[in-house]
Amino acid sequence: MLATDRTTLAQFLVEECRGRAGDDSELLGLLLDVAQACKTISKMTAMGSLAGVHGYNGDVNPQGENQARLDLMSNQAFVRATERTGHAAGLASEEMEEVLGFPESYARGTLLLVFDPLDGSSNIDINGTVGSIFSILPMPRPGEAPQTADFLQSGRQQVAAGYALYGPSTMFVLTIGSGVHGFTLDPLLGDFILTHPSMTVIPESGEFAINSSNSRFWEPPIRAYVDELLAGRSGPRSKDYNMRWIAALVADVHRILLRGGIYLYPRDTKTPDLAGRLRLLYEAAPVAFLMEQAGGRCTTGTRTMLDLVPGSLHERVPLIFGSAVEVERVETLYREPQRREFATPLFNQRGLFRD
């Protein structure tokens, strides 16, 4: 392993790929393309209102969500960083309804890039933390124009995944299947420098992240789990927990990699037609890859995330990840037979969060 003293992202990737079987030059090149896109986005977010990036443009993305100006600018940064380099065969993004192939006159690589160009965009106007999430998959039909079916692969097929975090400093965190490593952007040099080698998720922690305003819509296992945590020292867990919620998935992933804990965005009955809220292909799957590489766990509650195969580009799933002990406890509660829900409130299953 290279020393952390001023090791750049490019140097790190060259060293990592040198010990692997096969030619990883396209993977190395595509990761550097993604890093370049993230540098561009970092600069735009840092400029804020001075660059005219705040506010919404009146359009919606394929999921019906309002698109911020910076959503579209970030998406374009990914496209421009990858379209002419010959490292990718095609792209899929939260902000694009269909997959994007490149003109025949451009060189095509053998890898597919999927991404959420700007996670947590509701934080933009309040100068809150935002980020980017990405995943790299093999192209099943090298040399051909990419189709939607080419992208619908299980998380086990990922060859790399990671995120950028645009906070007080900009960080780029990734895995290529040999651990999770974090790099901090040196704004003077313009390079990502290795600062967090071999990041691991501690098996137990006293923090959890969930949007408690949805508690009345939670499934019984989630209610039971959160009730255990809120009971504190006098409850079954025999310790106090703190709740965190940043409204940016990337920020919660980063905190858990550094401090442990658990993140829950479960399925609920608020919108019963949705299986979950977060997208499998370019949010849940890359997070799952990072978590497993760092010694954590990731699940829907009933299924291991990396085993899922998306049925569509923008398929949604429940997402629960973090310290292994905590995630396993949630999985155990989902496996237990459901308690009978009595019609009479006096005998109904109760929790600390009331309906």
Swiss-Prot record:
GO CC annotation terms, alphabetical: cytosol
Residues bound to Mg(2+) 2: 116, 119, 283
Binding site for Mg(2+) 1: 94, 116, 118
Name of the coding gene: fbp
Keyword Metal-binding: yes
Enzyme class: hydrolase
Identification of the protein by name: Fructose-1,6-bisphosphatase class 1
Location(s), subcellular: Cytoplasm
GO molecular function: fructose 1,6-bisphosphate 1-phosphatase activity; magnesium ion binding
Cofactor binding note: Binds 2 magnesium ions per subunit.
Residue sites binding substrate per the record: 119-122, 211, 263-265
Pathway(s) the chain acts in: Carbohydrate biosynthesis; Calvin cycle
Domain of life (superkingdom): Bacteria
Family statement drawn from the similarity comment of this UniProt entry: Belongs to the FBPase class 1 family.
NCBIfam families: PRK09293.1-3, PRK09293.1-4
Primary location recorded for the protein, binned into one broad class: cytoplasm
Enzyme Commission number, as recorded: 3.1.3.11
Subunit structure: Homotetramer.
Keywords, in A-Z order: Calvin cycle, Carbohydrate metabolism, Cytoplasm, Hydrolase, Magnesium, Metal-binding
Needed cofactors: Mg(2+)
Catalyzed reactions per annotation: beta-D-fructose 1,6-bisphosphate + H2O = beta-D-fructose 6-phosphate + phosphate
GO BP of this protein: fructose 1,6-bisphosphate metabolic process; fructose 6-phosphate metabolic process; fructose metabolic process; gluconeogenesis; reductive pentose-phosphate cycle; sucrose biosynthetic process
